[in-house]
Design a protein with these regions (language model features):
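Hydrophobic positions on the alpha1 helix immediately C-terminal to the Walker A/P-loop
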Residues: 20
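Conserved lysine of the Walker
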Residues: 17
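Extreme N-terminal, non-catalytic leader segments
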Residues: 1-6
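P-loop (Walker A) phosphate-binding loop of NTP-binding proteins
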Residues: 12
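ATP-dependent NMP and nucleoside kinases share a basic, alpha-helical "lid"
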Residues: 88-167
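Small-molecule kinase domains that catalyze NTP-dependent phosphoryl transfer to phosphate-bearing small molecules
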Residues: 72, 117-124, 134-136, 140, ...
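Hydrophobic anchor at the beta1->P-loop junction of P-loop NTPases
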Residues: 9
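N-terminal phosphate/diphosphate-binding loop that engages ATP/GTP or pyrophosphate donors
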Residues: 27-92
């Protein structure tokens, strides 16, 4: 059994990475690091300053001003702070998805956040999800998983999530946004979305949440020797 281990979960937007990773971390009693939330926090900081997220120079210039903090509440849930203010809810607004995707393609942003992410894995056993965890952030992760589902399935899941938050959007718009983001994330020059050679691919499209979680946990335990 690994004394300290790391689990890297990659996959496209809306594949259920965050929800499943949180549940798996709770079941295993380890820390969950939501890297998407970290990039969304940078995106939110850019948004609040009225900066074009595609303007790499302008975004890089304000990075030193962003006092970004990652901490965990009493329930063990990750919270994000920006300049001392908790922005965990604000960064989940639908428009922040595009901001996160654009700023995450900027080399200066990735360099700015890379050490913060790696430091979490050095400190403790973690499950970390994102787009390039197994290929760039934690290339030596104990377990690498590529979680996926068809765009249509992911759009339906996203619509339900938005409805529960009281911010519903039309299915067609959500699907279009997901397809557009898939293309952008897969074709960007810096750390494009791709499956690590040694990652296990799990397609949850036809599975319930409980079935998906069971499959994920079984894979982690087998690969990590738990």
């Amino acid at each position: 059994m690994a004394e300290k281990y790391s689990v890297a979960i990659d996959g496209p937007s809306g594949a259920g990475k965050s929800t499943l990773a949180k549940a798996a971390a709770a079941a295993l009693g380890i820390c969950y690091v939501d890297t998407g939330a970290i990039y969304r926090t940078i995106g939110y900081g850019v948004y609040c300053r009225g900066i074009d997220p595609s303007d790499a120079a302008a975004v890089a210039a304000v990075l030193p001003e962003m006092r970004l903090e990652l901490h965990y509440d009493q329930a063990g849930l990750q919270r994000m702070k920006l300049a001392g203010r908790d922005v965990t809810e604000e960064i989940r607004l639908p428009e922040m998805s595009k901001y996160a995707s654009k700023v995450s393609a900027i080399p200066a942003v990735r360099d700015f956040l890379l050490e913060l992410q790696r430091d979490q894995a050095r400190r403790r056993s973690v499950i970390m999800d994102g787009r390039d965890i197994g290929t760039v952030v934690l290339p030596d992760a104990t377990v690498k998983i590529f979680l996926t589902a068809a765009p249509e399935v992911r759009a339906m899941r996203r619509c339900r999530e938005l409805e529960q938050r009281g911010t519903p959007q039309p299915y067609e718009q959500v699907l279009r946004d997901i397809v557009d983001r898939d293309w952008a994330d897969s074709h960007r020059d810096i750390a494009p979305l791709c499956k690590a050679e040694d990652a296990v691919e799990l397609d949850t499209g036809a599975l319930t949440f409980d079935e998906s979680l069971r499959l994920l946990l079984d894979t982690i335990r087998r690969r990590a020797g738990l």
